[in-house]
A protein has these predicted regions:
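Histidine-centered divalent metal-coordination motifs
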Residues: 22-23, 129, 151-154, 268, ...
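Short, glycine/serine-rich, charged loops/turns that create anion-binding
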Residues: 86-88, 131-132, 305, 333, ...
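Alpha-helical scaffold elements within enzyme catalytic domains, especially in hydrolases
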Residues: 9-12, 116, 266, 274, ...
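Acidic, metal/ion-coordinating pockets
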Residues: 1-213
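A contiguous, mid-protein "functional segment" used to position or interact
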Residues: 346-360
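Sequence context of c-type cytochrome heme-c attachment sites
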Residues: 220, 226-347, 364-383
Length: 383
């Protein structure tokens, strides 16, 4: 559902090229082919290949012509694109007639494909689904790449973890400029090419714009996204309700587990009172209002311990772990009353940016937000 909505949105925005990463093949080759038919843009990849021949399963490169205008003058520029994704030795997908799809080394694939692309393009752009370290190696191995546009494809990285500020916004290696996309489509990158009198690309001007609430949504695209978000939430709800209504087994006694904020209030009464008046104590209501209470991408920052052993499961089984309670920041506390330790649960403001990322919380300013949730001073005064 989400992929179909993304394709619809990319069509509406006039995308011309997209890099084929392993995620597009997660549901199998046949599903990808059907989605490819819906796309009004081209998928490229030089290192997702047929195992028997070593040939890419889609075009490895493509050229897009763009007309640049400066007053009465105009120039047609040929932009050459190559797609590269991380090499996963364990990746293996079945294709038609028993053929299999694998990945090969992206740097070697680039070396193989770029000589031909150089003959057809004025500027070469590499679209990469690589971690930053690999992306840095690309311009060292392959010359004449003018721009590298990247998105992180590290296994296990969630939407919450893949943040724009994980990477340099504008890092230059040799002649190539390396820029990484943010998460959730909330960052707009603008690149302006500058050509000299001979018509050659001499430099480029780059800017990254955070799409905060100051930028209104496109009504049509907002409707598409709202529809798919509600549909995904409903699907997740049905899957969750089909599971056992009972909570997961309690971890062994040797391990601390989550208990819920009410238990903390027995000793930390004043701190609990301050917390109860904060927006953290009502964080789950935000999901309910947006029909996203079953969205696994949202739950880690609106509940206690979602995805962790003994953490939040669903409203029926773990109602005590709803909202951003004490243990969401300070950790599981079941053993704390009996084994009080100095420094238990101690955190600092750096912990806040786990959830208050630029994508999820664009208005977050520590100096303004922290005073709204301060409760540790009151608790200390009581002692």
């Amino acid at each position: 559902m989400q992929t179909d909505a993304l394709i619809e949105g990319m069509n509406a925005l006039g995308y011309k090229v997209a890099n084929l990463s392993l995620r597009e093949l997660s549901h199998g080759y046949d599903v990808f082919v059907e989605r490819q038919k819906k796309a009004r843009f081209e998928f490229v990849s030089a290192n997702v290949v047929w195992q028997d021949s070593g040939e890419p399963i889609v075009a490895p490169t493509t050229v897009v012509k763009a007309t640049l205008r400066d007053g009465a003058r105009s120039k047609t520029v040929r932009l050459g694109f190559i797609g590269l994704t991380r090499n996963d030795p364990a990746f293996l997908k079945e294709g038609p007639k028993g053929r299999r799809i694998v990945t090969v080394d992206p740097l070697s694939a680039a070396e193989k494909q770029l000589p031909a692309l150089r003959q057809k393009a004025d500027v070469i752009v590499a679209l990469v689904a690589l971690d930053l370290q690999q992306a840095r190696q690309l311009p060292k191995r392959v010359k004449d790449i003018g721009l590298i546009l990247g998105a992180d494809s590290t296994p296990g990285r969630t939407a919450m973890m893949t943040r724009t500020d994980d990477f340099p916004e504008d890092t230059e290696f040799g002649r190539a400029h390396l820029l990484y996309a943010g998460d959730q489509g909330k960052v707009l990158g603008e690149i302006r090419l500058v050509f000299d009198a001979k018509g050659a690309a001499s430099s480029n001007q780059r800017s990254i714009i955070q799409l905060t609430r100051e930028w209104p949504d496109d009504p049509k695209l907002a409707e598409v996204m709202e529809t798919v978000k509600v549909a995904i939430n409903q699907y997740n709800k049905e899957q969750t309700l089909a599971m056992s209504p009972f909570a997961a087994p309690t971890p062994p006694p040797a391990e601390a587990t989550y208990t819920g904020s009410d238990r903390c209030a027995l000793c930390h009464e004043q701190a609990f009172t301050v917390w109860a008046k904060s927006s953290h104590a009502h964080a789950f209501q935000t999901l309910l209002s947006a029909h996203q209470e079953y969205n696994p991408k949202c739950l880690p920052c609106h509940t206690i311990g979602f995805g962790q052993r003994g953490g939040y499961l669903n409203p029926q089984a773990t109602s005590n772990l709803i909202n951003v309670g004490c243990e969401a920041c300070h950790g599981p506390s079941s053993r704390h009353p009996e084994q009080i330790e100095a420094g238990f649960g101690r955190i600092d403001v750096s912990s806040c940016v786990t959830c208050h990322t630029r994508e999820n919380s664009p208005d977050y300013v520590p100096a303004e937000y922290i005073p709204k949730v301060i409760h540790w001073k009151e608790a200390q005064t009581k002692r």
